[in-house]
């Protein structure tokens, strides 16, 4: 259907750029026809917790996953790849938020457009103004470097009768 990912082409592209692509698929997703071993592509096991890996990545490519909102905290580039958007929505897959309003940013609706975006991508890219707006809606104004201090203070000042000694 032309909407899937050509792993051979992607791997060749990654080899030339000395880059590694990590796939973390939805646990219900079954991968077929991945009989070759790719030098620059890894499929993470469905049980792997991807969150400890995220700070060491340069870019997130995602479809409808809520990881989009968590990755905003890293102030790194995000490419949305809803290649099956029409099919996804037609199957009455409810999203928690309006997809267009709450996932701003660069979008690729086909593998060809994804490859074009990756070819031109500047890995120094940070969040767009709209992505920062969404980050503020979900995470507030607290700078991440102070988050532990702010959370501790909140617990102490607003906690129940259980006191926290620090």
Predicted feature residues:
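A generic local structural motif
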Residues: 7-10, 46-49, 66, 93-94
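Short, contiguous acidic/charged loop-to-helix segments that flank catalytic cores in large enzymes
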Residues: 43-51, 102-105, 141-142
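Conserved catalytic-core segment of nucleotide-activated headgroup transferases in glycan assembly
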Residues: 1-33, 108, 149
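Catalytic binding pocket for nucleotide-activated donors in carbohydrate/polymer assembly enzymes
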Residues: 32-39, 66-139
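C-terminal alpha-helical cap of glycosyltransferases
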Residues: 144-166
């Amino acid at each position: 259907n032309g909407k899937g990912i050509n792993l051979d082409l992607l791997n060749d592209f990654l080899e030339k750029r000395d880059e590694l692509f990590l796939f973390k698929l939805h646990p219900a997703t079954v991968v077929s026809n991945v009989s070759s071993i790719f030098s620059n592509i890894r499929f993470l096991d469905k049980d792997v917790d991807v969150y400890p890996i995220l700070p060491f990545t340069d870019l997130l490519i995602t479809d409808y996953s809520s990881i989009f909102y968590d990755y905003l905290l890293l102030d790194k580039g995000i490419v949305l790849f809803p290649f099956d958007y029409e099919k996804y929505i037609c199957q009455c897959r409810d999203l928690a938020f309006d997809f267009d309003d709450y996932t701003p940013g660069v979008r690729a609706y086909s593998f060809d457009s994804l490859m074009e975006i990756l070819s031109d991508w500047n890995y120094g890219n940070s969040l767009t103004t709209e992505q920062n707006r969404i980050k503020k809606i979900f995470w507030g104004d607290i700078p991440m470097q102070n988050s532990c201090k702010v959370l501790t203070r909140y617990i102490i000042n607003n906690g129940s009768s259980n006191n926290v000694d620090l």
